[in-house]
């Protein structure tokens, strides 16, 4: 899976887990520097968070992450200053938070001696951008080494987070838990009715004629004969009317409008399948009910893998949050820092030229 795709999803469990955007670059820059690059962004570069004695997160780290994300998703707009301006303004708060988390995860990976070999990083870069990285120098003032560091950081962060989340989730989701979850869904399904039906509209030049035709259609349908749209249409036309037939609807209780549900519940199914004639501005309406059944689930053995995946996804989101909270506590990061950095009265982190 490419890094661009993993910016939106992370594969911790061999399944899809939604996460934040993840790119980054580690560097060391003075807190008072000011830089301008070809991307049309004036960077008010300063330290945003100190991870340890050797590593700090700076404004430039976030900008470089935005540069790669923008080029990965919108390469056709790379020379559009207005598009870049809108994109950076909208994405800055999200990327600011995730880049700090990424630095913390990379520090944790280093402590745990979890590494990504350079070959894997280069393969990822080539899969994303090909071998020509010159657009980064032209539009973003980024060297190939900068790009390498960004991709390397995301891969390292993904690996350590995946390992930490997966190991805990695998311990939580047991066969017994899957069976309990299945029974819960089965009990809920037993309270749901599923409806299969169509809505017929009948028109005629005179109101009494329309009612007469609708009565014949209702009678024909309740005789028990099989559904035959062509024969019904011919019947209506022979009586001087018009017939319009909806598609076949398959709905559960919660998906039905109040009017449709009321009309369907009045049908004495299965003794009859066509309800009473209803007047409507667009013509006379007939509800034709083909089936009404209680919702059932497939056997457990057919659903077990799917249910296990759902449970793992739920626990993964919880464990991901727990893992990041522990990192915040370990490295002394207060999430309120993000709010302070984004406050209206806070010093600008970057300007759009």
Curated annotation (Swiss-Prot):
<protein>
    <recommendedName>
        <fullName>Uncharacterized protein CT_355</fullName>
    </recommendedName>
</protein>
<dbReference type="GO" id="GO:0003755">
    <property type="term" value="F:peptidyl-prolyl cis-trans isomerase activity"/>
</dbReference>
<comment type="similarity">
    <text>Belongs to the chlamydial CPn_1058/CT_355/TC_0634 family.</text>
</comment>
<feature type="signal peptide">
    <location>
        <begin position="1"/>
        <end position="24"/>
    </location>
</feature>
<dbReference type="InterPro" id="IPR046357">
    <property type="entry name" value="PPIase_dom_sf"/>
</dbReference>
<dbReference type="InterPro" id="IPR027304">
    <property type="entry name" value="Trigger_fact/SurA_dom_sf"/>
</dbReference>
<keyword id="KW-0732">Signal</keyword>
């Amino acid at each position: 899976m490419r890094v661009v795709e993993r910016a939106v999803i992370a594969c911790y469990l061999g399944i899809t887990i939604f996460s934040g955007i993840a790119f980054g670059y580690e560097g060391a820059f003075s807190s008072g520097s000011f830089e301008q690059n070809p991307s049309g962004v004036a960077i008010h570069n300063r330290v945003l968070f100190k991870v340890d004695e050797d590593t700090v997160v700076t404004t430039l780290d976030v900008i470089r992450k935005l540069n790669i994300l923008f080029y990965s998703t919108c390469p056709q707009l790379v020379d559009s200053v207005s598009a870049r301006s809108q994109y950076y303004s909208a994405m800055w708060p999200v990327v600011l938070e995730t880049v700090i988390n990424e630095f913390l995860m990379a520090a944790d990976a280093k402590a745990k001696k979890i590494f990504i070999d350079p070959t894997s990083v280069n393969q990822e870069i080539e899969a994303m951008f090909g071998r020509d990285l010159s657009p980064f120098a032209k539009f973003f003032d980024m060297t190939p080494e900068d790009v390498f560091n960004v991709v390397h950081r995301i891969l390292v962060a993904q690996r350590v987070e995946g390992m930490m989340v997966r190991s805990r989730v695998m311990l939580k989701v047991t066969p017994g838990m899957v069976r309990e979850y299945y029974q819960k869904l089965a009990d809920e399904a037993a309270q749901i009715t599923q409806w299969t039906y169509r809505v017929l509209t009948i028109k005629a030049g005179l109101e009494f004629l329309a009612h007469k035709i609708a009565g014949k259609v209702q009678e024909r349908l309740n005789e028990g004969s099989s559904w035959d749209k062509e024969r019904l249409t011919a019947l209506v036309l022979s009586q001087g009317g018009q017939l319009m037939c909806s598609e076949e609807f398959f709905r559960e209780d919660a998906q039905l409008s109040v009017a449709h549900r009321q009309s369907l519940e009045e049908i004495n199914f299965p003794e009859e399948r066509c309800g009473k004639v209803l007047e409507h501005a667009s013509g006379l309406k007939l509800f034709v009910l083909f089936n009404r059944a209680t919702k059932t689930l497939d056997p457990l053995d057919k659903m077990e893998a799917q249910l296990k995946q759902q449970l793992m996804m739920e626990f993964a989101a919880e464990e991901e949050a727990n893992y990041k909270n522990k990192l915040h506590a370990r490295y002394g990061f207060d999430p309120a820092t993000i709010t302070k950095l984004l406050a209206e009265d806070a010093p600008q982190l970057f300007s759009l030229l």
